[in-house]
Structure formats: structure tokens, C-alpha cells
């Protein structure tokens, strides 16, 4: 049975893990790193670059490099490249495809099944978009699970007894805080809250804004209008943020950042940890609201928290650690987990649970936001309250607002506001064919069904006629089935193009190596190669060099074969010469040995003569 992987599809970085012998293992990518930047770029030749290679070329290819696309999941955002529109699902699928390839290279087998994690506070539309991304990448998404739940599973699996765990998850682009009860193989989420637009990217942006302001006041030039300069500033800001986690001061030095009439200008600033914390204090403040809301929703006090687990690279910032310590009444956050990897490890464990490889583990997750419909007066009527354990199903009876109303429109929302329009609209559908009747008479049963992925199915049924209409809510930004199928085909085409490009690069590299090696052999063995063989080989080499100047891969292959055949003749000639030389040497050596024997006899007798006289 093929193994399933666990994937943490992050805003900034992504990680893939797998169970080996019952133990979770983080899989290193093709570049040897355990995390892969969630960056996708389109090279000028159309090649799709993913990960570190895409991140490295971002400065010189700003317009065609996409990062932090997770922040656009579940929206109608698109990027236009080479005459094509790419959705967040497609861009995420490129990242997932790379993780899939790296896992297959590591395991030596095809990978199709995966558990993918999402922020706990992701809406239905964002969850569905993540599932679609997996499908486009050629993955069968076994389950979408919440990142804090996954982290708690990884953290507590080997521990004994029951405990209440607070997971504080601050990633590159999203923030969640969750309270979970764990024990006896059960991981139960009590409450969750968060902010899907708060993360390390915002800390970076605060530093970028500060640098732009400083440079403007010093030089009178606004760098925010220069896309290439802004990309360099973003990279420098991220580096400075990371350095300030272990140092109290860092230098930001960017030579030739721009130019004025007088010549090139350089950026050189010092940033202290204290100044960095002042610049970003408003961001830290935004994490407090969700924390207090979770404590309130779970109905516990801070002193009932047994363990605090920090998740996400942004929790390495000292100010974040200090704040968590302060909020939890002085509790020391656990240092035993890797904040970058723990979510993927938990996802691999959940994949093992679903495949039957891990026994006696049960995840009880919750829906992060209330679900309901719009009723008369624009009121949001909740059918399922937030923090309800999933999977779940709830029904309620509604009626018509007008006499002889032939249909009702069901507008589905997700959120906490009392007025429907202020919440996130997930979808709309109509129940038609209601028989004429006075208002208030028809009975329409609306049922919400949330599956274990947190994805919603809504059914409206006229109890009088038995007529029913249902829809799987996938959000206003959801992709139609035919679009997903088209994107799957396109992803496969890109993968095929990439495979061809890799083959072409290998063919070209092998050909160049063959030229070098063959010329080296000729130069080192000039006297041993017959003139006709030498001329034939040089002619073949000239043909290969000419082919390498062009782009016809078949011509390069054909020319390489000719050089290889000619090289074999060189090898035969050298081998033949060596054999003749060694044969002659062996004959000469035999004569020498015979002569030595005769000499030895004479020399041996000489002393006897001397001794007798």
C-alpha cells in the first residue's frame, strides 16, 4: 500500500513529512533543505521555478515571482503571466507538486495520498481552495486538518496522561491560537481563534516601511516606486528580523539600491532589537484579542493551561516569546518542538491514522466560525456556532416571508456578526417549486452538514412537497469542476515541460562533458592514435560543437552518439598500442632476466676463485 504524506503548506515555507517504521520523518527537498520556500516564479523561457531557486532570482524577476499566495486562498485573486491567468490554487499546486516530487525521490515510490494542514481560522472557501490545489497537483487529499491540532498531535503523542495545551501559531502570513485537551490518544480542540492576515510578512513590511522612510528623508528618493529596490528591501528586512532574534543589533547594507543625478546611492542602516520591537508593537498587540477570546470560549482560566507550544517561524522572535509568557501567567513555552516542522510531523501522523498505520489516536476538531443563513431583515441566523466539534449536522425549519412565494433563496454565511452582509458570504442557491400558500405556512428545513475537512454541505427541503436542493459550499471564489480539470491538465503539462527541460539540460551537459573528455584523451595520447581515427573523432567533435551552438536536442544526441563511437575506436587503438608495448617489454624483460642468471653464476664463482688462491 502506497504511503501517505503530511504537508504543511505554509505562507512563507512548506514542509513534507512521512511515517517510517511508525515514526514521523521530515523529508529533505532536492536542494537538501528540510523547508521549501513557498515561492513560485516563471523564468523568461516559461520554465516554472519553485522553492529556493525561485526565491533566489526574485530580485531580477520581480513581476514574474509570486510569494505568500496563501493569503489569497479563497479569493478571486489572479496573476497574469504570459497571456494566462493563474489562481492561488494553481500557484499553490506548483509548490505541492515540488513537495510531491521530493517525497517520491526520497521514498522511491509514487506519492498520491496526502493530509494537508491549514490555519485553524481558515474559512470554508479557503479550505476548499486548499483541497483544490492538492487535486491540481495530482494529490488525493485524504484530510484537511488545522495546523494547531496537527502540532498538538505531534507534541503530545509520546506523552502520558491528560493535559490542556495552548498552541500559539504565528506563521509567515497567518495567526491562530487554540486550546486543546489531550490524553489517551484523543486530541480534542476546545476553542480556536485567529487572524488570517497577521504573520511574519507583516513584521518584514514594518521594517521595509521604516527603511523607505529613512532613505527618503536622507536622499529625497521614494524607493517604494522601484519594484526591484522593494524586493531587495523585503529580503533585507526578513534577514534583519531573523538576525534580531539572536542579536541585539543588525546592519542593513544594500549597495547601489538606486541612483540620483550625482551617481549611485547606497542604503546603510543600523537596526536595534528595541527599535524593531517598537516598529512592530502594534502587530504584537493584535495577537492578544484572539488569545483572550479562546480562553473565554473554552471556559477555562489561564492557570489551567498545562503546556504552551509555539508553532511557526515567527514565534522565534523574543518579543513573541515574552508576550506568550506574560499572557499565560509566566508559563515557559515548550522548547522541545521545531516550530517550522511540528505541523508537518502532525500531518504525517494523521495520514498514518487515516491509513491505519497509527492506532488509538482520535482527532476531534472544531469549526472556527459560526455558520448560518440570511433571514428577513438581513439578519444572520446561526445554525452551527463556532467551536462546534466536527463532523457535525444541524437542521432548522424556516418559512416564507411573502404570500404565494414560489421560491426561497438560501444565502449561506460564515462569521460572528449579527447582520449577514458583514460576514463572509459562502454561497447562494434557490429552492424552487414551492406551492402557493400564505406566508408562514410552507415549512422549509435547512440542514448544514460539516465534514471532517471543515467543508460545508447545505440542503434546503420543502417538507410539504419533499422537494430538495443541496449545494456543497465552496465559496464565491471556488473553482468549477471543469476549471479544476483544466488546471490539472495544465499542471501535468508544466510537469511534462519541466521533465523535458531537465532531460534537455542533462543531454547538453553530457554532450559538453563528452567533448571535454574526448579532447583530453586525444591530447594525452597523440602518439598512440592512428591518424585516420584521430581525424574521424575530430570531425565528430566539430559536429557536436556545432550542434551545441543550436537548440535542437535531437541533433545534439545524434552528434554525441557519433563522438561516442569514434571515442571507442580511440580506446581500442590506445589499448592495442599498450598491449604491443607491454608484450615487447615483457620479451625484453625475459632476456634481461636470463642475462642476470648467467651473470649471477659467473659472479658467484668469482669469490671461490679468489678464496682458493
UniProtKB/Swiss-Prot annotation:
The induction comment states: By stress conditions e.g. heat shock.
- In the record, Phosphothreonine modifications are located at 174
Q: Which UniProt keywords apply?
A: ATP-binding, Chaperone, Nucleotide-binding, Phosphoprotein, Stress response
Compositional bias, Basic and acidic residues, is annotated for 495-509, 521-535
Q: Which domain of life is it from?
A: Bacteria
Low complexity: compositionally biased ranges: 575-592
Q: A Gene Ontology molecular-function term?
A: ATP-dependent protein folding chaperone
SUPFAM superfamilies in alphabetical order: Actin-like ATPase domain (SSF53067), Heat shock protein 70kD (HSP70), C-terminal subdomain (SSF100934), Heat shock protein 70kD (HSP70), peptide-binding domain (SSF100920)
Q: Where is this region: Disordered?
A: 495-535, 575-613
Q: Where in the sequence does UniProt note compositional bias of the Acidic residues kind? A: 593-604
InterPro entries documented for this protein: ATPase_NBD, Chaperone_DnaK, Heat_shock_70_CS, HSP70_C_sf, HSP70_peptide-bd_sf, Hsp_70_fam
> Family per UniProt?
Belongs to the heat shock protein 70 family.
Functional note:
Acts as a chaperone.
Put simply, this protein is called: Chaperone protein DnaK
Q: Which organism is it from?
A: Thermobifida fusca (strain YX)
